Design a protein with these regions (language model features):
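Amphipathic alpha-helical polymerization modules
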Residues: 1-83, 192-224
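Polar, low-complexity export/assembly segments characteristic of proteins
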Residues: 65-222
Length: 224
């Protein structure tokens, strides 16, 4: 019937938009990974080169932020269920926020994104649509395999929370540092490492970002 076809069309459009946007981000992250490999190889770490690398990182960050806030059919593609305000914003220090919460403070428990106080991140709830697969209920809940997801929180792929990285700093000291899992935030840390001419830290951050890049690729495969 017509409603069924409309639902199917809506699902296809939303998945295509999410896949396309995530592919844009993956390309940008891959470019950064290649850029940083050049920066840490020892022949491109003079101040002029480092400044160029940092400027390129800033341009890439701007592109990632634009992709995160991309719109399709009046809906933020990666904003969860936020259709009214820009989902991904920056504070004065340049930290990335998702629907008002610093991405570094977000955790994921029992299918829910939580802030540092254990409250659900605003507008991050998943929504689903029935396209005739026989929606099955389990009490008040439904089997997600019998419906299609219609809202996506981009942090599922671009990263949230923090992890530890280990490296030997430029003074020869072993360092354990807590860093963001979000690719945007990692790029900001990379800019700091470039400014400090700390190539070991930069390399460790690049390895860390590669893990999140793999998560982005998995997301593209799931959406495709």
């Amino acid at each position: 019937n017509e409603q069924y076809q409309r639902n199917v069309d809506a699902v296809v459009a939303q998945y295509d938009a999410a896949e396309g946007t995530l592919t844009e981000i993956s390309d940008q992250v891959q470019n950064v990974h290649s850029l940083i490999l050049k920066a840490v190889n020892g022949t491109n770490n003079d101040e002029t080169s480092r400044n160029i690398f940092s400027e390129t990182l800033q341009q890439t960050k701007d592109g990632v932020l634009k992709s995160l806030n991309a719109v399709n059919l009046d809906k933020y593609i990666l904003g969860g269920v936020n259709n009214k305000t820009t989902p991904y914003t920056l504070d004065e220090a340049g930290n990335l926020f998702f629907n008002g919460v610093n991405v570094d403070d977000i955790s994921f428990t029992d299918g829910v994104y939580l802030d540092e106080n254990g409250n659900q991140v605003p507008l991050s709830k998943e929504t689903y649509i029935d396209i005739g697969l026989g929606l099955r209920m389990h009490g008040d809940n439904f089997n997600k395999d019998t419906a299609f997801q219609m809202s996506f929180s981009g942090i599922a792929w671009t990263g949230y929370g923090i992890s530890e990285i280990n490296y030997t700093d430029k003074n020869g000291d072993e360092v354990t540092e807590e860093v963001s899992n979000n690719v945007y935030q990692i790029m900001s840390s990379m800019q700091e490492a470039l400014e400090e001419n700390d190539m070991n830290r930069l390399g460790a951050l690049n390895d860390h970002m590669k893990k999140q890049y793999d998560t982005i690729l998995k997301g593209i495969a799931e959406l495709g």
